[in-house]
């Protein structure tokens, strides 16, 4: 523990908080244009073909985003809304596509957790 004299000589250094989603530039979501749509395999214990796409944001950043839900209509040059939040078993993927916003449609025939996938309320 430092003495008062040491603290007067040199103050304590504040720890800077590093952003988990730097490309969003402190915004909740950002708009971007899809550059490439492809599939990737997850890390070791899991096995699947995860749908991802490369997006160029309006601020110039470029990053890989995950497309959640079953089936999608994301195409090259499509305008997408992107939110933060990584995918645990996909290294380098730190963003999610917002389903049901801009050029990305919601998940069809989704009954539960509809708000997360932009699905319309089913007819009673």
From Swiss-Prot:
GO cellular component: small ribosomal subunit
Pfam family name, one: Ribosom_S12_S23
Function description: With S4 and S5 plays an important role in translational accuracy.
Keyword Protease: no
Family affiliation: Belongs to the universal ribosomal protein uS12 family.
Quaternary structure (record): Part of the 30S ribosomal subunit. Contacts proteins S8 and S17. May interact with IF1 in the 30S initiation complex.
Top-level taxon in the UniProt lineage: Bacteria
Official protein name in the record: Small ribosomal subunit protein uS12
Recorded name of the encoding gene: rpsL
Cited Gene3D superfamilies: Nucleic acid-binding proteins
Keyword list, A-Z: Methylation, Ribonucleoprotein, Ribosomal protein, RNA-binding, rRNA-binding, tRNA-binding
Matching CDD domains: Ribosomal_S12
Residues modified as 3-methylthioaspartic acid: 89
Biological process annotations from GO: translation
InterPro entries noted in UniProt: NA-bd_OB-fold, Ribosomal_uS12, Ribosomal_uS12_bac
Entry's Gene Ontology molecular function annotations: rRNA binding; structural constituent of ribosome; tRNA binding
């Amino acid at each position: 523990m430092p003495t008062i004299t040491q603290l007067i000589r040199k103050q304590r250094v504040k720890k800077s908080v590093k952003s988990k989603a730097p490309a969003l530039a402190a915004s909740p979501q950002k708009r971007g244009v899809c550059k490439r749509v492809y599939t990737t395999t997850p890390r070791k214990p899991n096995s699947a073909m995860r749908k991802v796409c490369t997006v160029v944001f309006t601020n110039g950043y470029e990053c890989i985003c995950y497309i959640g839900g079953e089936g999608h209509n994301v195409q090259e040059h499509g305008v997408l809304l992107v939110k933060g939040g990584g995918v645990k078993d996909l290294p380098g993927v730190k963003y999610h596509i917002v389903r049901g916003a801009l050029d990305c449609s919601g998940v069809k025939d989704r009954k539960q957790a509809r708000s997360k996938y932009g699905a319309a309320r089913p007819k009673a």
